[in-house]
Amino acid sequence: MYFIFHFICSQCVAFYRSLFVANILHQHKFSFPIISVGNISLGGTGKTPFIYYLARICNKLKIKHVVVSRGYKKLSSGTCVVHDGKQTLCYDPLITGDEPLMLALKLKTTPIIVDNKKNRALHYVKQAFPQHIVLLDDSFQSHYIRKTFEIVLFNCLVQKKDLRFFPFGKLREPLSSLSRAHFVVFTKHNLSIKENKAVHSALSVVKKNNIPYLYSNISSSISQHSINKVQPIKWKQTPLKKLPKNNILLLCCGIGDPQSFIQTSQQYEPNICQSLLFSDHYNYAQNEQSFMQKIKLLYIKHGFSGLLTTDKDFIKIKNLSLKSIQWFAEIKLQFFIVDIKIHLIEEDKLIRHIKSLGP
């Protein structure tokens, strides 16, 4: 039965793509370079840390750049300027989406534009930032946009059983679609014990089509956040090398690949009483009543003193209502945030391509 489903999906993907090749459907072309960062599987490949990495490379090379994202699961419509290159203009993740806001707070000088219609966002960039190159998030499937350079990320933790179309597996497209990429990065390489069959299959397609590729590793840092003042809300942030001893922690996250977060956080030897895992881009504000009820019940059960989570989750948790923040302050709850960064092995191979797109 799955064979039939796979055949139908593959044919649909190929047919849709062929409409653009035959100019039946038209691609929008822009005068500035567009670097696409995407994947062929659902969630957890590390697109946001990779966008952050590319933005930092552009800064080092003094290449003007802007990040464009659809702001997945944001509640706003139209074009939203999260960061104008000088300051963050919106701090509400419900309006911006969690990942664009996280990038705006980290990058500080990179314009961040979100719009559920990427084409509209690119037209805005054309007017507002005409001399910039675009880092276009999650756009490998955006066939209606002509992209200059296609980077595809492939998670080394993906298993062979995941190489099926959703909902039977994690694929958005067949592995053969990797042939459209200009560059492939195999992410989270240091978390995989060995190259599994899924990576081997993807690598076969990449090598067959002579596509340049690299491996990337991830590293992390951890910081402690506490509430200094409730009205107005003020937070104190303290970088840490390790977790305080004897702290009982509740692990909480809503990301695409929670297992890699759990695996990465083990280096800090956390004393985890329980894990609270939600779907990717979990909306804490919309589910605040349910979330707080779970937190309070687990607090009664375990008496934890801290919450171990990701920066992507934390920007949404600290945006909860004043009532929830007050409760966190009353029990003196500490938040321990694990921040993920990527490191490319032999990164010069990719940097050469980025340089060629600059001025």
What are these regions (language model features)?
Residues 159-303:
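C-terminal accessory "lid"/substrate-recognition subdomains
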Residues 1-33, 357-358:
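A transmembrane-helix-recognition feature enriched in membrane-embedded lipid enzymes
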Residues 72-207:
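Phosphate/Mg2+-binding loops and adjacent switch elements
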Residues 305-312:
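Acidic beta-strand-to-loop metal/phosphate-binding motif
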